[in-house]
Amino acid sequence: MDPNCSCATGGSCSCASSCKCKECKCTSCKKSCCSCCPMGCAKCAQGCVCKGASEKCSCCA
């Protein structure tokens, strides 16, 4: 259970503009929670809700 999330690990949760859930899928915005990608990564910007800055992002792989 993620302390920042209202659901069990791997489950679903709702999120606002910023996401604190690490292992959850957001249901309200239909996007995964992940780290922000560097500028220029349109794929991550469109498919993720940022929870923090990072040089590497699973959505950009």
Swiss-Prot record:
GO terms for molecular function: metal ion binding; zinc ion binding. A divalent metal cation 5 binds at residues 34, 36-37, 50. A divalent metal cation 7 binds at residues 50, 57, 59-60. Transmembrane segments: none annotated. A divalent metal cation 2 binds at residues 7, 13, 15, 26. Keywords: Cadmium, Copper, Metal-binding, Metal-thiolate cluster, Zinc. Pfam families: Metallothio. GO terms for cellular component: cytoplasm; nucleus. One of its GO terms (biological process) is cellular response to copper ion. InterPro entries: Metalthion_dom_sf, Metalthion_dom_sf_vert, Metalthion_vert, Metalthion_vert_metal_BS. Belongs to the metallothionein superfamily. Type 1 family. Monomer. PANTHER family: METALLOTHIONEIN, METALLOTHIONEIN-1E-RELATED. Class I metallothioneins contain 2 metal-binding domains: four divalent ions are chelated within cluster A of the alpha domain and are coordinated via cysteinyl thiolate bridges to 11 cysteine ligands. Cluster B, the corresponding region within the beta domain, can ligate three divalent ions to 9 cysteines. This is Metallothionein-1L. It comes from Homo sapiens. The gene is MT1L.
